[in-house]
């Protein structure tokens, strides 16, 4: 038995989960928030307990030290060397990383170079890797990429209709994201349906504050909604998703909001989506509450959100020539029953239908009516478990 920790480092946060492997038992999990700010918050959950403390945490290395010391303080481990492997979520692997990889040689430098593809994510992911390397230099360290699952896409799906030189020289193509989640729920869907994954055609919908939809055939990604960066695809909590590119130069010319690349990134990534249209919130719970109160902007935002998701599902039904199941996962996909009902009701003529008695908050599994030809599944994602499994596989 070994202890492996899965890490998801953000620019000011560190989410973690400690596993006993190969039993895949969660020993503890936690979240450190507001790194680099005053009054940082560290939360540790274990054995049904939850402990929280307010600290000043200056950087990721200090955050990792606090995490490890808490594991000892709460008697979850006796010493640092009980942890034999650490896996790090990294958003962008580009064309260079086609699978999870042990951190050695120039791997970390390559991860940092690929920050051009995920400027909001890769630098923070790399900071987490460096912090653990500094404190636990001798354990196996693995990077697990959101993009790896999508490297199976055919060229017709990942290329953009731009001059070829922008692909060959600048690597402009679709990379996708959330691959670890899509891979996990596809495997769980096969178990739930009692059929080999290789025989299935699935549409997996990872819908959280960020969101993406993937067409999965025989266990492989054949197309996905996110593009060159996680900005593409469906409308999201604060991101536009797909828009006409000509909007950008138009707004640069006629408004004061788009003067620099940073301005463009800020508006499209952080001020748009549900938040931008509703002028209220990026959180689906707030949007649904505002809709119930008759708020027009919130209602429009919700309708646009559902509409974009329905269109991508329809598109991928065409790509796959039908589907065996549509899978909902992540924060909104797992918990917003009205949202699931509304998405499916608009595409019911494809042969999918939701049973209202099964489609309730907190329920997972098959929520379809008996007569539905395409099953509708709710499956909680577990990206941390996939990361831990990859660490164990690569340690061998």
UniProtKB/Swiss-Prot annotation:
Gene3D superfamilies: 3.30.420.40. It is found in: Cytoplasm. The keyword Secreted does not apply. ATP binds at residues 15, 206-210, 283-285, 331-335. It catalyses: acetate + ATP = acetyl phosphate + ADP. Its cofactor is Mg(2+); Mn(2+). Belongs to the acetokinase family. GO terms for cellular component: cytoplasm. Mg(2+). Can also accept Mn(2+). InterPro entries: Ac/propionate_kinase (IPR004372), Aliphatic_acid_kin_short-chain (IPR000890), Aliphatic_acid_kinase_CS (IPR023865), ATPase_NBD (IPR043129). This is Acetate kinase. Keywords: ATP-binding, Cytoplasm, Kinase, Magnesium, Metal-binding, Nucleotide-binding, Transferase. GO terms for molecular function: acetate kinase activity; ATP binding; magnesium ion binding. Pathway: Metabolic intermediate biosynthesis; acetyl-CoA biosynthesis; acetyl-CoA from acetate: step 1/2. Catalyzes the formation of acetyl phosphate from acetate and ATP. Can also catalyze the reverse reaction. The record marks 178, 239 as: Transition state stabilizer. The active site is at 146 (proton donor/acceptor). NCBIfam families: ackA (TIGR00016). Substrate binds at residue 89. Its EC number is 2.7.2.1. One of its GO terms (biological process) is acetate metabolic process. The gene is ackA. Mg(2+) binds at residues 8, 383. Homodimer. Its main location: cytoplasm.
């Amino acid at each position: 038995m070994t202890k492996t920790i899965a890490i998801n480092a953000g620019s000011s946060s560190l989410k973690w989960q400690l596993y006993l492997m190969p039993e895949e038992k969660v020993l503890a999990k936690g979240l450190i928030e507001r790194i680099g700010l005053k009054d940082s918050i560290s939360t540790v959950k274990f054995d049904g307990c939850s402990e929280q403390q307010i600290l000043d945490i200056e950087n990721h290395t200090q955050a990792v030290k606090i995490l490890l010391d808490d594991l000892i303080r709460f008697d979850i481990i006796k010493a640092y060397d009980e942890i034999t492997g650490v896996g790090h979520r990294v958003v962008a692997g580009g064309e260079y990383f086609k699978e999870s990889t042990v951190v050695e040689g120039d791997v970390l430098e390559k991860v940092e170079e690929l920050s051009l593809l995920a400027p909001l994510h890769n630098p923070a992911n790399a900071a987490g890797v460096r912090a653990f390397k500094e404190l636990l230099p001798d354990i196996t360290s693995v990077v697990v990429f959101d993009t790896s699952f999508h490297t199976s896409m055919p060229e017709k799906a990942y290329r953009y209709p731009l001059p070829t030189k922008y692909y060959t020289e600048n690597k402009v193509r679709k990379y996708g994201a959330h691959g670890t989640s899509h891979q996990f729920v596809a495997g769980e869907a096969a178990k739930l349906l009692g059929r080999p994954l290789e025989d299935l055609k699935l549409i997996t919908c990872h819908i959280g504050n960020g969101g993406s939809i993937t067409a999965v055939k025989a266990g492989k990604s054949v197309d996905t909604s996110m593009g060159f960066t996680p900005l593409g695809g469906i409308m999201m909590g604060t991101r536009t998703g797909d828009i006409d590119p000509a909007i950008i130069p138009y707004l640069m010319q006629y408004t004061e909001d788009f003067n620099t690349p940073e301005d463009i990134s800020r508006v499209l990534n952080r001020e748009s989506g549900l938040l931008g249209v509703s002028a209220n919130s990026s959180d689906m719970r707030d949007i649904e509450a505002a809709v119930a109160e008759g708020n027009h902007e919130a209602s429009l935002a919700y309708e646009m959100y559902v509409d974009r998701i329905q269109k991508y599902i329809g598109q991928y039904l065409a790509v796959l020539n039908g589907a065996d199941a549509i899978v909902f996962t992540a924060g909104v996909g797992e918990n917003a029953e009205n949202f699931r009902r509304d998405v499916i009701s608009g595409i019911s003529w494809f042969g999918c239908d939701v049973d209202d008695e099964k489609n309730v908050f907190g329920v997972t599994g098959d929520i379809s009516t008996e007569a539905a030809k395409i099953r509708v599944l709710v499956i909680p994602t577990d990206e941390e478990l996939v990361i831990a499994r990859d660490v164990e596989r690569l340690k061998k």
